[in-house]
């Protein structure tokens, strides 16, 4: 699959609109996320490994905020023959259209219901795995606990939630250090100072990261009895919570 290079913020603009997962972003998303999120490939691959361990036959898997389908495809490769169904949801028509193309390129005996809709409206039931891969951070903070509660209720006992997020830190020097390390990561991947600055402006009103403590407290308050941070690189993290 050809991957187009992300140059969305390469030209100076007087007015930076809020970031949207529109057709422009969908067309370069694979390149954008690889160059912006440290450890993204490892996270995607490990989601597949978690699926192999936790997905039970005749259950459902939910990929909430599926974007181009990377996590869904990783899961699909690991659960052949289990008579499961994946429900992959994204609210961007452009993302869903490209996700469908990616799903069509791979043969599998695991059906995928690809839904263009709001993840807050999805009914979750008989789930052995739910994935929120850099999705929760884009929801209004007041809606996050309700979604986690819905996920907990829809998971079967022993089911797992994989939650990946950009995180923030209450310790100001640590916040500054790891934010700077992330900016260096983006510079090393070819982004200019202009691109970094303009994308930051586009994201500041639409992406609101939480601290790890907030994530853990939210998960345990809704009933998850087992929680662990399994991956962190700079200010990006992935967690698991087991019912």
From Swiss-Prot:
<feature type="binding site">
    <location>
        <position position="40"/>
    </location>
    <ligand>
        <name>S-adenosyl-L-methionine</name>
    </ligand>
</feature>
<feature type="binding site">
    <location>
        <begin position="90"/>
        <end position="91"/>
    </location>
    <ligand>
        <name>S-adenosyl-L-methionine</name>
    </ligand>
</feature>
<comment type="similarity">
    <text>Belongs to the class I-like SAM-binding methyltransferase superfamily. Cx-SAM synthase family.</text>
</comment>
<dbReference type="GO" id="GO:0002098">
    <property type="term" value="P:tRNA wobble uridine modification"/>
</dbReference>
<dbReference type="Pfam" id="PF13649">
    <property type="entry name" value="Methyltransf_25"/>
</dbReference>
<protein>
    <recommendedName>
        <fullName>Carboxy-S-adenosyl-L-methionine synthase</fullName>
        <ecNumber>2.1.3.-</ecNumber>
    </recommendedName>
</protein>
<dbReference type="InterPro" id="IPR041698">
    <property type="entry name" value="Methyltransf_25"/>
</dbReference>
<feature type="binding site">
    <location>
        <position position="133"/>
    </location>
    <ligand>
        <name>S-adenosyl-L-methionine</name>
    </ligand>
</feature>
<keyword id="KW-0808">Transferase</keyword>
<feature type="binding site">
    <location>
        <begin position="65"/>
        <end position="67"/>
    </location>
    <ligand>
        <name>S-adenosyl-L-methionine</name>
    </ligand>
</feature>
<dbReference type="InterPro" id="IPR005271">
    <property type="entry name" value="CmoA"/>
</dbReference>
<dbReference type="GO" id="GO:0016743">
    <property type="term" value="F:carboxyl- or carbamoyltransferase activity"/>
</dbReference>
<dbReference type="GO" id="GO:1904047">
    <property type="term" value="F:S-adenosyl-L-methionine binding"/>
</dbReference>
<feature type="binding site">
    <location>
        <position position="200"/>
    </location>
    <ligand>
        <name>S-adenosyl-L-methionine</name>
    </ligand>
</feature>
<comment type="function">
    <text>Catalyzes the conversion of S-adenosyl-L-methionine (SAM) to carboxy-S-adenosyl-L-methionine (Cx-SAM).</text>
</comment>
<comment type="subunit">
    <text>Homodimer.</text>
</comment>
<keyword id="KW-0949">S-adenosyl-L-methionine</keyword>
<feature type="binding site">
    <location>
        <begin position="118"/>
        <end position="119"/>
    </location>
    <ligand>
        <name>S-adenosyl-L-methionine</name>
    </ligand>
</feature>
<dbReference type="InterPro" id="IPR029063">
    <property type="entry name" value="SAM-dependent_MTases_sf"/>
</dbReference>
């Amino acid at each position: 699959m050809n991957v187009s290079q992300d140059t969305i913020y390469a030209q100076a603009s007087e007015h930076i609109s809020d970031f949207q997962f529109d057709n422009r972003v969908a067309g370069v998303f694979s390149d954008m996320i690889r160059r912006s999120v440290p450890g993204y490939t490892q996270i995607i691959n490990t989601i597949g490994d978690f699926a192999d361990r936790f997905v039970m036959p005749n259950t459902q898997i939910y990929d909430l905020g599926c974007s181009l389908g990377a996590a869904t495809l990783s899961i699909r490769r690991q659960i052949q023959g289990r008579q499961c169904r994946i429900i992959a949801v994204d609210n961007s028509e452009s993302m869903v259209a490209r996700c469908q193309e990616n799903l069509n390129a791979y043969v599998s005996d695991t059906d995928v219901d690809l839904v263009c809709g709001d993840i807050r409206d999805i009914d979750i039931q008989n789930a052995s795995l739910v994935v929120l891969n850099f999705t929760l951070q884009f929801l209004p903070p007041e809606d996050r606990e309700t979604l986690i509660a819905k996920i907990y209720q829809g998971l079967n006992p022993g089911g797992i939630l994989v939650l990946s997020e950009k995180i923030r830190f209450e310790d100001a020097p640590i916040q500054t250090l790891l934010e700077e390390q992330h900016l260096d990561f983006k510079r090393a991947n070819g982004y200019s100072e202009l691109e970094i600055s303009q994308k930051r402006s586009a994201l500041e009103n639409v992406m609101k990261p939480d601290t790890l403590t907030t994530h853990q407290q939210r998960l345990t308050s809704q009933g998850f009895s087992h929680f662990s941070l399994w991956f962190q690189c700079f200010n990006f993290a992935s967690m698991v919570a087991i019912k």
